Amino acid sequence: FIGLLISAGKAIHDLIRRRH
């Protein structure tokens, strides 16, 4: 569960950083 949360958070963070 924690691994999935970290993966999702990392993916979201990457998406936000790419959008900027």
Curated annotation (Swiss-Prot):
- Cellular location(s): Secreted
Could you name the domain of life of the organism this protein comes from?
A: Eukaryota
UniProt KW keywords: Amidation, Antibiotic, Antimicrobial, Cytolysis, Hemolysis, Secreted
Tissues expressing this chain: Gill.
Entry GO CC: extracellular region
Supply one GO BP term: hemolysis in another organism
Q: Which residues carry this modification: Histidine amide?
A: 20
Q: Report the principal subcellular site.
A: secreted
Tell me, what does this protein do in biology? Has hemolytic activity against human red blood cells. Seems to disrupt the membranes by adopting an alpha helical conformation. May play a significant role in innate host defense.
Family that this chain belongs to? Belongs to the pleurocidin family.
Protein name in UniProt: Chrysophsin-3
The organism is Pagrus major (Red sea bream)
* Source lineage: Eukaryota, Metazoa, Chordata, Craniata, Vertebrata
